[in-house]
Amino acid sequence: EATLSWRSVAHHFQLDGARAVVADIGGGSLELIGAVDGLVEATASLPLGAVRTTETHIAGHRDMPKAIEGLRRHARRQLRKALPWREWTAPVLIGSGGTFTNLGRMAVARRGLPVPDSIHGSRVTTAEVEQLLEWLATRTAEQRRHVLGLNVERADIIVAGLAVTAELLDLADARELTVSAFGLREGLLLEMAGATPQLPSDPLLQAALLVYASD
């Protein structure tokens, strides 16, 4: 899965000469890829998906700040094992998957700007992630369903996803992250098409990538 995420990101971002960390938060796992100058040097799959961590650390807890604190400690322990972070501090950090696309849309909305149809390539600061996490933690799941920029289907799991994201940013000492609207499904399409790490020239493949952009 990490390899598929990387194929997708490498098609949409110029990473030559950069030290990059790509994160894809799914339902059950977090896929991490560390790359230097466009070449993958490390990968990890951690049990830190948004659904899994909601079930293990968030669901049923009345004291949300305490639950989030516990999840963040758990995430930090897992993340420390994933990469030699002393070698990966302050990287270009790219997030793909629904947690990140929803984060991007909410961040734009919180700035008082119109939420665009595509959030691909937008940037969210670490401070914005922390502020959104703190704010969403004070809302019930029903209230989160009405948050501008948040897909109602993610109202139950967004807090856990952002808690993991916040720890990732902190551990990487990154000031911001860049949102990719393309993830595992797109990586699979690219692999099936035998595409190289450039934007595909086939218009049918381009259309398929747009249709399956993460929500």
Tell where the protein language model's regions lie, with residue ranges.
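Helical "lid/coupling" subdomains associated with nucleotide-phosphate turnover
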Residues: 1-19, 34-36, 42-215
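Catalytic cores of RNA-modifying enzymes
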Residues: 23-25
